[in-house]
Structure formats: structure tokens, C-alpha cells
């Protein structure tokens, strides 16, 4: 039996360090894909870098739980990760990013999707509330209002980020975390449709 290896990083938690909050994406794809899924890979790398920088600068307290960043090989890699995990019940949530780089020019819509009713959790509620906040702040900024959190990159576009909040949406690596063997709640961040997929 062979060994499965993939890129991973972690921000160690404090009092609940043995519990994980995962951020996942898939690192590879059979065809070139800046959006599918280099965008998800870069997004979780940037989340890791930003959180660690804020912690190092004492602008954000170290999290209670460990935040683990995973770059496995598509669905098969996620299955292997869970199957070989010492105790998957320690994974308290999974936030998956697959195709998060679309823009209005590609006619894609950013979506924040929750999990199935069979894996009840407040995770989707939190994700949807953050999404509504971002929608509100970026829309008001685009309309010329002075807002506390413009949430735009200086070198980026000034159009609002208008995410859709959805229930369960399948079709990526996050599916296996919801599966009955593991029943790990989570969010799926993605854009769809994508005119240029594969």
C-alpha cells in the first residue's frame, strides 16, 4: 500500500488545538485552469498568509481551534485524506474553494453554498451572513457611499461583489466531507456558471 502526500499548512490553535477547521481546494486538474482551480489554491494560500500575519502582528488572537489548509488532488485526494485521518471527528468544519476567480466579464456569479440537511450546522448561516455583509458594503461603495469596509483591492475593479447564498450545491471536493461516513459540516465557495471552464 502506497503513501498519499499533499501540500498542507496549519495555524495551531490554543485550547482546542486538537480540533481542526479545514480550508480546502484541489491542487491539480487534467486541463489548464487559472480559475479551476488555481484560483481556489491561491485564495486559501492568501487566507493562510493573511491570518498568520495578523496573528504575528497581534492584530488577531490565535484561534481556539487549529486552522488547517489542504491542497489535495481533487475528490480522490480528499477521500484519501479522510480515510487516512487518525480521527476525522476532530474536523469540525470544512470550507472549500473551487473556482473563486470569476468576474463579471466571465458572466459568472459567486456563490456561498451550505451543506445538506443531513449534516445540520450553523456554518452555512455564518457564511451567508458574512456574504450578505460583503454584498452590502461593496454595493454601497460602488454606488459612491462612504462605507466602513469598502472591501476592494486598490488595483482591482470597483464593481460590487454580489454573492448568492445557496443551500447544498454539489460537484466538487467538498462533497466527500458531507458524506455519511464523515458528516463534516462546511461551506462551498465557488462561481458558476463559468463560460471558460476547461
Which ranges hold each PLM region?
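A generic short-segment signal for beta-strand/edge and adjacent turn/coil regions
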Residues: 34-40, 62-67, 153-159
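Metal-dependent peptidase/peptidase-like ectodomains
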Residues: 1, 16-18, 72-186, 193-197
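Soluble metallo-hydrolase cores and metallopeptidase-like ectodomains found primarily
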Residues: 1-35, 45-59, 66
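Gly/Ser-rich catalytic serine loop of serine hydrolases
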Residues: 29-42, 74, 169
Amino acid at each position: 500500500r502506497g503513501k498519499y502526500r499533499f501540500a498542507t499548512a496549519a495555524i495551531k490553535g490554543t485550547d482546542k488545538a486538537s480540533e481542526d477547521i479545514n480550508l480546502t481546494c484541489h491542487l491539480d486538474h487534467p486541463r489548464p485552469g487559472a480559475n479551476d482551480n488555481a484560483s481556489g489554491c491561491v485564495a486559501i494560500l492568501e487566507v493562510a498568509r493573511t491570518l498568520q500575519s495578523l496573528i504575528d502582528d497581534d492584530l488577531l488572537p490565535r484561534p481556539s481551534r487549529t486552522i488547517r489548509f489542504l491542497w489535495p488532488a481533487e475528490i480522490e485526494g480528499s477521500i484519501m485524506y479522510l480515510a487516512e485521518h487518525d480521527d476525522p471527528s476532530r474536523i469540525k468544519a470544512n470550507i472549500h474553494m473551487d473556482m473563486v476567480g470569476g468576474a463579471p466579464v466571465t458572466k459568472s456569479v459567486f456563490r456561498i453554498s451550505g451543506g445538506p440537511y443531513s449534516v445540520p450546522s450553523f456554518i452555512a448561516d455564518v457564511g451567508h451572513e458574512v456574504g450578505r455583509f460583503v454584498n452590502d458594503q461593496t454595493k454601497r461603495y460602488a454606488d459612491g457611499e462612504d462605507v466602513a469596509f469598502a472591501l476592494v483591492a486598490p488595483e482591482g475593479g470597483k464593481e460590487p461583489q454580489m454573492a448568492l447564498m445557496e443551500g447544498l450545491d454539489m460537484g466538487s471536493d467538498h462533497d466527500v466531507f458531507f458524506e455519511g461516513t464523515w458528516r463534516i459540516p462546511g461551506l462551498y465557495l465557488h462561481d458558476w456558471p463559468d463560460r471558460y471552464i476547461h
